């Protein structure tokens, strides 16, 4: 496809995060895309799960309808009404992927729009603002989500155009995608961050909603067909799911077999508030991960690597 066509390709992003140092080499800009085929109970970005633009509501910022009624008046779908405490109630069945006039009209930013339609050119203009940092640190752009391959055409166009502009590229993927979509994008990638959550298929399906077979198959295919691309496999350590020696040792053994790097990520609760903003329950509740468990599991990874 031509550069002109790629630059005009449109996708739905929900954040462009500057100066990230944890999502690939160097200083990076992370482009977060909407949509994910998994429904992980521990997901810290609930706003990433659905492909559509979504409206969130932070009641703590609301001026209440006693002082401001802009959102009620401007909503063309009739989705916003008065709640008993003079805040607002959002009918999610009526709220649709509109122009989000209500969040634009909200003077206190209590209404938040998660998601924006952007072209490849718009995204890369934001990414290229930090080109000096990339040059000095070996950084670049990382496409994350959600799941980048849930928007395969946009992801491919974004990677192709980034390559034309000599921007170092990386992708964060759960691996649950069409291999054809992944294989089309991989020639334009410099680095891959790949999630493996559990090798027990039944437990993986129970916790994420999908089988892990395609995920493991795609990782093996990636290593076989694109051996020159550095891969970092990452596992979020989740209390009650994979915070044990057997699960982590099994994944560590797979990464050793495939010759890829491996990293554990500690569970955190930073996304809990966003569930409430979207009128959803946070599935993990008040669960926490203790530091001693992480130290023990990191020792397991080190031992497996040395064996």
Curated annotation (Swiss-Prot):
GO terms for biological process: alkanesulfonate catabolic process. Binds 3 [4Fe-4S] clusters. One cluster is coordinated with 3 cysteines and an exchangeable S-adenosyl-L-methionine. The keyword DNA-binding does not apply. Pfam families: Fer4_12, Radical_SAM. Pathway: Organosulfur degradation; alkanesulfonate degradation. It is an enzyme of class 1 (oxidoreductase). Its cofactor is [4Fe-4S] cluster. [4Fe-4S] cluster 1 binds at residues 36, 40, 43. PROSITE patterns: 4FE4S_FER_2, RADICAL_ACTIVATING, RADICAL_SAM. [4Fe-4S] cluster 2 binds at residues 62, 68, 71, 106. CDD domains: Radical_SAM. Residues 53-85, 86-117 form the 4Fe-4S ferredoxin-type domain. InterPro entries: 4Fe4S_Fe-S-bd, Aldolase_TIM, BssD/PflA/YjjW, Organic_radical-activating, Organic_radical_activase, Radical_activat_CS, rSAM. Residues 22-307 form the Radical SAM core domain. It comes from the Bacteria. S-adenosyl-L-methionine binds at residues 42-44, 146, 195-197, 268. One of its GO terms (molecular function) is metal ion binding. It catalyses: glycyl-[protein] + reduced [flavodoxin] + S-adenosyl-L-methionine = glycin-2-yl radical-[protein] + semiquinone [flavodoxin] + 5'-deoxyadenosine + L-methionine + H(+). [4Fe-4S] cluster 3 binds at residues 75, 95, 98, 102. Keywords: 4Fe-4S, Iron, Iron-sulfur, Metal-binding, Oxidoreductase, Repeat, S-adenosyl-L-methionine. Monomer. Involved in an anaerobic respiration pathway that converts the sulfonate isethionate (2-hydroxyethanesulfonate) to ammonia, acetate and sulfide. Catalyzes activation of the isethionate sulfite-lyase IseG under anaerobic conditions by generation of an organic free radical on a glycine residue, via a homolytic cleavage of S-adenosyl-L-methionine (SAM). Belongs to the organic radical-activating enzymes family. This is Isethionate sulfite-lyase activating enzyme. It comes from Nitratidesulfovibrio vulgaris (strain ATCC 29579 / DSM 644 / CCUG 34227 / NCIMB 8303 / VKM B-1760 / Hildenborough).
